[in-house]
């Protein structure tokens, strides 16, 4: 049976949480993700066998997920899980990938019964998850679930251990900046020299249509490399070439052809910021401070500072691009303006025309650091003819998400639209000529070229009320010029000249302003233009004809593209703000229902989903979701139809009777509380009736009558005697 995405996420995270104990998130994530991987390959193999199609992963008999579920409560569950994983690894060249996690480690999972309960509960988390039978829809479901887990693990892992994950919004931004779309051919190659869990590579490949791109990646951390390889298989990219971990890309690059670095069509990267030991494995001349043993000529434009590897990664990426190659790399903001050796390298790269664009991002977007970062967009094609660098200041574009900042969909879309069109927007974007950059000593600090926008009060009513008078500063009213261009008579209707220099005077009372605006013909025309734009989206017709198997993500992207097109025609409205409203509504309301409809049409409305509890150490049932109905002590959830509608349609009489009884109970409880309060005062009936457990035990102990001790009804009499 299909399950809501949001409920899948909460179940997965609850499973991870139940396992964590004293483990760090960087450790317990491996147990959860390994089991998700085992569930996926098991379901995929079953479905491939059923459809007589090729399966990239062989699952031996006795190693399917139902065999794992059968281990629930087994005293040797940890050891037997290890053996199942070892056999799958042996058959599929996955040694060192999926068998690096020890499911029999009592230092992490507890001893004896504690381990048995923890693992039994964990394997049950994935029991109801069905993967592999619905093609692309399952890929979306699994990919989003994996992304959800990775983001939460990164958030919980702390500063030094969250760098394996690049936020999905940033991954999407980099991929779109490269111009990858459904028309990009599968033989186009993409490379990430610091690939972490592979999220950047997979996001870029997913944009290239059904067959994706040819993927290459290298990661130094061995456990993260294993995570990356699993991630590739989970996302139908089992043939991705991921180098075995353990060696640095800078000192020991894996992808070499004919003695030179292999060149790729696209490169994406989010390398560790300001790496201090980047020279490990390389030799630096103590006098010239130049690398003297790099056979790949990566440092011909200069050697970065010995204690800061930002430009070392950038130079490696440039050398790894084909002559027509394109790249996008995340680096700390300091690479734009730091001087000395880095300034010289930056000048050389700009002179050669390799840097096409620079985008300043908000601070605190990444899990490994809170410092501001930027995107360096590289393009070797037509580099010799490049006359400038396109800059975007998106440092104010984000939303708060716990203790981190996140890019919104509207932020990414605005950056991409602006960059692709090379559109100059006041306080946001600008094409800066190389002559101007040269005049600034090749400093790329965005603030030198794009003036920050002064924040002003957006609410006219709040502005007027804040001054608590009939006078308003002219310089503050200027901020509303775009509105006065649409509502042309509004300014003269609201304000008049005053006897106070630099101020306007109000013509009308403050409390009448809102009615005056909303009742004006200009506002009515504006309101009509908004409704007309909405009508042109044809949403009701679109949503009334949803066929089973439709792709919810594709549909919402199509709708949001229309939103941008239609609301561009509406003056003063921010089309990206409207775009975000649709995205938020989809994420918070529509996507769960759409996925259910896509999987099962309206069959999901005919069924209640049984909730399976986890058992705590006392064998008490623990449910991960709140039930909608309890029938003979069994808990059920209605996924598609709200429970209140079911009650109204099928249990109207019972619901009214229940409501009547609940109201009566509430009245009696209120009367009882009032009675207790009234008679607990010094002169009340209960003043001397001080009964509690200790008093009762004491009185019973002192009682001489056996009947008093045996009969609870006598307790009040004993206590008051």
Feature map (PLM): residue ranges:
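Conserved nucleotide-binding/hydrolysis micro-motifs of P-loop NTPases
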Residues: 38, 43, 197, 222-223, ...
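Hydrophobic alpha-helical scaffolding
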Residues: 112, 135, 194, 214-221, ...
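Conserved S-adenosyl-L-methionine
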Residues: 160-269, 273-290, 295-301, 311-312, ...
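Hydrophobic alpha-helix feature that most strongly marks membrane-spanning transmembrane helices
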Residues: 209, 233, 237, 272, ...
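A generic structural signal for well-ordered coil/turn residues at beta-strand boundaries
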Residues: 263, 267, 371-372, 385-388, ...
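Conserved P-loop NTPase
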Residues: 375, 379-416
């Amino acid at each position: 049976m299909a399950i809501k995405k949001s409920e899948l996420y909460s179940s997965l995270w609850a499973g991870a949480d139940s396992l964590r104990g004293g483990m760090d998130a960087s450790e317990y994530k491996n147990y959860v993700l390994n089991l998700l991987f085992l569930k996926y390959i098991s379901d995929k193999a079953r479905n491939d066998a059923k459809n007589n199609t090729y399966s990239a992963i062989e699952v031996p008999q006795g190693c399917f997920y139902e065999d794992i579920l059968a281990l629930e409560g087994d005293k040797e569950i940890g050891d037997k899980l290890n053996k199942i994983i070892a056999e799958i690894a042996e058959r599929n060249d996955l040694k060192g990938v999926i068998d690096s996690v020890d499911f029999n480690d009592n230092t992490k999972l507890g001893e004896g019964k504690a381990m048995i309960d923890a693992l039994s509960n964990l394997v049950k988390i994935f029991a109801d998850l069905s993967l592999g039978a619905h093609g692309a829809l399952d890929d979306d479901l699994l990919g989003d679930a994996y992304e959800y887990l990775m983001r939460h693990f990164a958030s919980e892992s702390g500063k030094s251990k969250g760098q394996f994950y690049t936020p999905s919004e940033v991954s999407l931004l980099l991929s779109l900046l490269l111009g990858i779309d459904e028309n990009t051919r599968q033989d186009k190659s993409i490379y990430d020299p610091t690939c972490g869990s592979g999220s950047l590579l997979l996001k870029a490949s997913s944009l290239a249509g059904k067959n994706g791109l040819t993927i290459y990646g290298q990661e130094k951390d061995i456990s993260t490399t294993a995570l990356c390889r699993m991630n590739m298989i989970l996302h139908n990219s089992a043939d991705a070439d991921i180098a075995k971990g353990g060696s640095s890309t800078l000192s020991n690059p894996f992808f070499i052809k004919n003695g030179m670095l292999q060149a790729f069509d696209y490169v994406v990267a989010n390398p560790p910021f300001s790496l201090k030991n980047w020279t490990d494995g390389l030799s630096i001349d103590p006098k010239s401070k130049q690398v003297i043993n790099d056979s790949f000529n990566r440092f011909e434009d200069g050697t970065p500072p010995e204690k800061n590897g930002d430009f070392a990664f950038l130079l490696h990426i440039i050398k790894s691009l084909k002559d027509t190659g394109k790249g996008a790399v995340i680096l700390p903001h300091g690479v734009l303006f730091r001087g000395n050796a880095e300034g010289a390298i930056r000048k050389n790269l700009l002179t050669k025309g390799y840097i096409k664009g620079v985008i300043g991002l908000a601070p605190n977007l990444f899990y490994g650091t809170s410092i501001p970062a930027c995107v360096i967009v590289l393009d070797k094609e037509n580099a010799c003819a490049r006359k400038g660098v396109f800059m975007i200041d998106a440092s104010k574009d984000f939303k708060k998400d716990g203790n981190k900042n996140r890019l919104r969909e509207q932020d990414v879309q605005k950056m991409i639209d602006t960059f692709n069109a090379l559109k100059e927007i006041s306080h946001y974007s600008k094409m800066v000529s190389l002559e101007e950059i040269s005049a600034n000593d090749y400093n790329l600090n965005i603030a030198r070229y794009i003036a920050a926008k002064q924040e002003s009060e957006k609410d006219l009513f709040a502005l007027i009320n804040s001054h608590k008078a009939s006078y308003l500063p002219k310089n503050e009213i200027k901020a509303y010029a775009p509105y006065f261009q649409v509502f042309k008579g509004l300014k003269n209707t609201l304000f008049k000249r005053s006897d106070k220099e630099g101020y306007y005077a109000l013509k009308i009372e403050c409390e009448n302003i809102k009615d005056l605006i909303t009742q004006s013909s200009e506002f009515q025309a504006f309101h009509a233009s908004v409704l007309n734009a909405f009508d042109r989206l044809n949403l009701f017709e679109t949503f009334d004809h949803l066929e089973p198997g439709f792709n919810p993500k594709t549909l919402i992207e199509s709708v949001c593209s229309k939103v941008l097109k239609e609301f561009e025609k509406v003056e003063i409205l921010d089309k990206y703000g409207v775009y975000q409203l649709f995205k938020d509504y989809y994420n918070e309301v529509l996507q769960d229902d759409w996925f259910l409809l896509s999987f099962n049409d309206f069959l999901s409305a005919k069924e209640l989903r049984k909730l399976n509890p986890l058992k705590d150490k006392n064998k008490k049932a623990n449910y991960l979701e709140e039930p909608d109905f309890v029938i003979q002590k069994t808990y059920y959830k209605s996924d598609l139809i709200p429970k209140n509608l079911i009650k109204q349609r099928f249990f109207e009489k019972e619901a009214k009777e229940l409501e009547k009884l609940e109201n009566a109970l509430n009245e009696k409880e209120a009367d009882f509380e009032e009675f207790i309060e009234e008679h607990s005062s010094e002169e009340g009936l209960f003043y001397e009736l001080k009964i509690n457990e200790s008093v009762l035990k004491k009185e019973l102990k002192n009682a001489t009558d056996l009947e008093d001790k045996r009969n609870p009804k006598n307790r009040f009499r004993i206590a008051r005697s």
